[in-house]
Swiss-Prot record:
It holds the Pfam family Ribosomal_S9. The keyword Ribonucleoprotein applies. One of its GO terms (molecular function) is structural constituent of ribosome. GO terms for cellular component: cytosolic small ribosomal subunit. PANTHER family: RIBOSOMAL PROTEIN S16, RIBOSOMAL PROTEIN S9. Keywords: Ribonucleoprotein, Ribosomal protein. Coiled coil: none annotated. InterPro entries: Ribosomal_Su5_D2-typ_SF, Ribosomal_uS9, Ribosomal_uS9_archaeal, Ribosomal_uS9_CS, Ribsml_uS5_D2-typ_fold_subgr. Belongs to the universal ribosomal protein uS9 family. It comes from the Archaea. The keyword Ribonucleoprotein applies. This is Small ribosomal subunit protein uS9. GO terms for biological process: maturation of SSU-rRNA from tricistronic rRNA transcript (SSU-rRNA, 5.8S rRNA, LSU-rRNA); translation.
């Protein structure tokens, strides 16, 4: 009979992007959509997703494995959603109030989220706010 492994599942949203993070005991590996984080080509996206682990410290990072599944939205929206899901899962996995305070002091949106959405396009307009120029003569 095998030992039961501790698994924490957390999800987050940013704009139209969604992310789900699974954290379990491991060796410090992080996978985003079944690809190791080291192989993600855009460095800014890679660093944004790794922020919660860098703030948590090497002692926590080396003891866990994380699997993040993202879908919807664009690249940066998915990165923000993955970052938020990872931070929430780390706080839940460790049960540390100190880690939560570190995240809130660094960036509140790491745990709380960002409710801003793109304004939809209106009828007879080019975009959400732009209207045809009015001519008086």
């Amino acid at each position: 009979m095998s030992e039961e492994q501790k698994l924490v599942i957390s999800s987050a949203r940013r704009k139209t992007a969604r992310a789900t993070c699974y954290i379990y005991a491991g060796k410090g590996r992080v996978f985003v959509n079944n690809v190791p984080i080291e192989l993600i080509p855009i460095e800014m996206v890679r660093l944004k997703i790794m922020e919660p682990l860098l703030l948590a410290g090497n002692d926590i990072r080396s003891k866990i494995d994380a699997k993040i599944i993202t879908y919807g939205g664009g690249i940066m929206g998915q990165a923000d959603a993955a970052r938020m899901a990872l931070a929430r899962a780390l706080v839940k996995f460790t049960g540390s109030k100190e880690l939560e305070k570190i995240y809130r002091a660094y960036d509140r949106t790491m745990l709380a989220g960002d409710p801003r959405q793109t304004e939809s396009e209106k009828w007879m307009r080019y975009s959400a706010r732009r209207w045809r120029q009015k001519s008086y003569r």
